[in-house]
Amino acid sequence: MRTQKLLALLLALILCLSMMTGCAKKPVAPTVPAAPAAGDSPAPAPASTPKPTAEPSPEPTPEPTPEPTPEPTPKPYVEPTSERGGMWDLVPFDEMPYERPSLDGLDAAIEAVGEALDAGEPYEVIEPLLDACDDAYNAFYTMYSISFIRSCQDKTDEFYADEYAYLDELSADVSQRMEKLYFRCGMSDMAQELEEKYFWPGFAEEYADDSNAFYSDEMVELLQKDANLVADYRELVANPIVTLSDGTEVEYFTALEEAEGFSYLSLLFAYYNQYNPQLAQVYIDMVKVRQQQAVSAGYANYEELAFDHSFERDYSPEQAAEYLQAIKTYIVPLYKEYMDTGAYWSLDQGSLDAQRLEDILRYGVSDMGQEVQDTYEFMVKYRLCDLEYSPKKSEMSFQTYLGAYEVPFLFMDSSGNLGDITTFSHEFGHYLDGFVNYDADETLDLAECFSQALELLMLTRLDEVLSPQELDTLYKMKMGDILSMYVQQAAFAEFEHIIYSTDPEDLSPEYVNQVFLQLCVDYGFSEAGFEDLYGKLWIDISHFFEQPFYVITYPVSHDIAMQVFQLEEENPGAGLEKYLAMLHRDYPDMLDTALNAGLESPFDPGRLEKVAATMREILLG
């Protein structure tokens, strides 16, 4: 029985790691503050973790007779009239052409701006030249995003994998070029006029001295080394081959699709034993390069660089550390108590085919107002989403933006069960934000507020399209996921803090594994006797490799989402109203947006106690 309990715990934990690390809006790629309508780079590749099948209990209980699925009440729909206005004519995603972008156009456009500034040309001459720079920038990142999406749609497609790796390395050069353009404008006699008419408040002061440039030649070289290491990581996890105890070599993901119970567990041990040392070395090399980036940019360490430059957070690493300690105090004990009941592991997520999923999603968004419904139908009309299951797809879900077309794209790794509803809702929250706001500048913490809040709002709108049993399961599953998210993402955040606080020369695969194992113990998601395996599970967290210091965003931003949910529970419609008001935001930052909406800061005294009390009432009564 103990081994079966371990198996259930491991499978659920690994699945949770896969689900929670696969929900990013966009990556922390090297970028500069974008001029109006600038595009984004694509989202990262989260952990490659398959969907497990647990061995059945030796004393199975009879399955209850399924309740009939209610027929949804049809709701009127008005054809969307949105005109996106991108520089390229919008076509369905699968008809969008791909062509490797050249930087010649961007270089020529930047040179033309410099010549016009030197010649003292008026703003009316310079504005279209700056627009040409933005167009070239958008074209590059649109192709970057398309290559990423298509490499995720078929991870065996070597063409798009190579294209994405090439453009990922080149992105540092693009950022350096754009930064030089901004300094050229900020150091010109027209700096103030350009700030007022074209750029953003504070632009002239920010770019008045190019000795403060972030993208030095040294930094670009380090970023390219980082990109090459990311490519090495992606190659390792794309299609791993494991050697079994009898010497047989098998494709890991293919074998997992067919394995069950103890065979599944044996494959896990084989994979982690063989790939942890390789991936750990890649990770250590990444940490060394990133610490060098921090020195190059004048930061004390990479954690400070990530908080200040990469994520532009409106809270400090010190505040984050205090928040993690509060999670240990108020959330971890509740997590341990709830998980000991076994209720979370016994939830049956059932099955959900693609057509029924589409019916459920369409019904849910139809009850969120015309704007949300229009956005969904526009997405479907132009096939700006991929919700289909395929064994060739990357095991992740994300949303990214196609700047040249002025539209987002939603990618989801479908599991074929009720969990697809919340996975879609999360990414559609990102999609809705990107669509409504044309991907206007915002911090990732704010972006996660919109995605996590929509997950919870969707739960409140499915009573006519799910059976009572399905809705109860989905509700409990989501609440358990939230509790796990607070605990596990906090552990991951502390893991990164410890690793990046260690002298890089003292890092080894054994040390990294030991740090992660100790945090598994401290945060309550480990099993005595299987320490060797638990210490190696961290290699499934793609954010460690591709988006360092992202994970703290999940628990911090979820506090805002929980406040929206509580409003909806107390007064139906109030939470949605608050959400839509926040969506049309006046601020790019999480705290300013939340406080302006009348919500509390996640860092206010007592906030985590309130979250724990709410979760206890829902999960333990």
Describe each PLM feature range:
Residues S18-G22:
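C-terminal motif of bacterial Sec signal peptides marking the signal peptidase cleavage site
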Residues A24-K26:
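Bacterial signal peptide processing site
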Residues P76-S351, C520, Y587:
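A well-structured
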Residues E206, F424, E464-V465, Q489, ...:
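C-terminal, non-catalytic "cap/extension" segments appended to globular domains
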Residues Q325, T329-Y330, N437, E442-S484, ...:
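Post-HExxH zinc-binding segment in Zn-dependent metallohydrolases
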Residues G342-P408, N417-L418:
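Auxiliary, metal-adjacent structural segments of Zn-dependent hydrolase domains
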Residues A404-S425, D439:
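Short pre-active-site segment immediately N-terminal to the catalytic Zn-binding motif
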Residues T423, E427, Y431, F435:
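Catalytic glutamate of the conserved HExxH
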